[in-house]
Amino acid sequence: CVGCAFSALDNKDIQAAYNYIQDLGGKEQATIIGWGTKENLPQATLINSLLVRALDYNDIYWEQDPSHPSDIIPAVLSTGEFMKKDGKEVLVGIIIAYELEMRLCLAAFPGVREIGWHHATLTQLVSPVVAGRMLGLNEEEIVAAIGINGSSHFTLGGVVAGHLTNMKNAADPFAVEAGVQAALLSSKGYTGPVEVFEGKEGLFEVMDKVKWDRDILTKGLGDSFLINQCGYKAFPTEALTHQPITAALEV
């Protein structure tokens, strides 16, 4: 994760994003990897997640849906730094991020990617939980944060279809940033729909072209951890290119 971030510091898209964040300014709350400067929590989360994702080299989990769970780690790092959490708490936050993201990748048949949605649609439901926990939110506040983010950040699959732009590697980081924003809003008393999954016009009802196995989301939670099943890339390229690259190298 951190290695991917440092390796991406000279990317043009990263430079553009960093300049954008510098122009915005704000309170110095969390550190930007590589630069060492500090920005407010959402902005630091965004640029750090962009750094992790920029080279397309970070980890991958692909079952019914694909995902890059390490995109969410910057939400843990920024809020953890701000709240002065110790290493144990940061590790717990990372494990929670992986567990929830990967369970969502298992729960839809077919995956949401198969019906035209990007996996950031799943990340938007995970990032507020992780950020909320690190910020010390109670259960009611975390539910509100999920509702805030989960009702407002569905992402079209078009970001990875056809001619690719910088949004290919930015869609998930934006969902991570938004999760931190949602948690911060909730901490101030802001509310969101509490049944964003199962309620009227919620996730399960609106995405009715897939069948959701709700038990996958909670069954055996805490007994074992999916983070151990996440994969790593051999090349800094899109996952589906790895087979032809390997074949070419062996010819």
Q: Which residues are covered by each model-predicted region?
A:
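A conserved active-site cap/scaffold subdomain adjacent to cofactor or substrate pockets
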Residues: 220-251
